[in-house]
Amino acid sequence: MLANFVLILGVLAFTLALRTYRHPFLQKLGALGILATSYLTGYLLTGSWGIGLACASTWLLLPWLDLITRIRKLTLPREKSLRNRPPPGAHVFPNLSELTEEVEENGFEHIADAGWDWEDYQQFFRLFYRADERVQAAVCLVDQQDVAFYYLSLSSRAKDGTIWTTWNYPFSYSLKLAPHWRVNRVKGDLSFLELFEDHRAFLKKHGIAPELLEELDAERIPLEVQKDLRAQVAHNLAAGVLKPVGDAEVRYSWRGLLFLWLQFLRDLVRLT
């Protein structure tokens, strides 16, 4: 029995060590190691491979508890409306001033503070624009119940309607991306300058020269962001991820819950 405990602890320590490396392959091995540790715990302590598999599968099936009991009941507005709003306090978003300075140091002009609220869900956007490169930037805060996180994004709008976005959103996105939206997801530990350089490389890779980008009126940017949010909801209604609830609300369908679960599995092994 002692040998079994030592083996389990050894595999766990090796797994945690793998997760500390920055290499994607080692990170994914570490994620598989979590499943292996759970399997060994069940198998070695009971002698049953079935219990071992049950312990390992708990990591994969546990999200369904939250999906069925909470997410399935959530509603969202069918048409999200951005409004001007004051920035959150330092106790809510202590990094906002520092991030703002970092964005402005790279040639961006602060355009507006906007956001939308729905029940326990709040989203705040600090919007910027750099006219010479026709690129908009945003510092975004998502606050839902007891969970809050922020991310940075850079977007360039092509004249053909395609939106090219580079961001460090920390999770797999909870909605299907609209067909006209091309996303380049990068690591969360990049500075804004590194994010900006990555966005430039993203545009260059796809042959998007500055003259192919739409030049925006700064005052129009909040309306464009609102338009993007509404387009996402409309696309996911059409895809069956969301379903209407009355005339003004939507919620996740069973297909949508399955989509969220698959997104969770992607996050389980993805380098973030």
Question: Where are the regions that the model predicts?
Answer:
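Alpha-helix initiation/capping motif
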Residues: 1, 22-24, 130, 140-142, ...
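N-terminal alpha-helical membrane-insertion module
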Residues: 1-81
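N-terminal topogenic membrane-targeting module
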Residues: 47-125
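A residue-identity detector for tryptophan
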Residues: 49, 59, 64, 116-118, ...
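Short, isolated positions within intrinsically disordered regulatory regions of eukaryotic proteins
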Residues: 53, 168-171, 185, 258, ...
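Structured extramembrane domains adjacent to transmembrane segments
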Residues: 93-237
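A eukaryote-biased signal for long
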Residues: 211-272
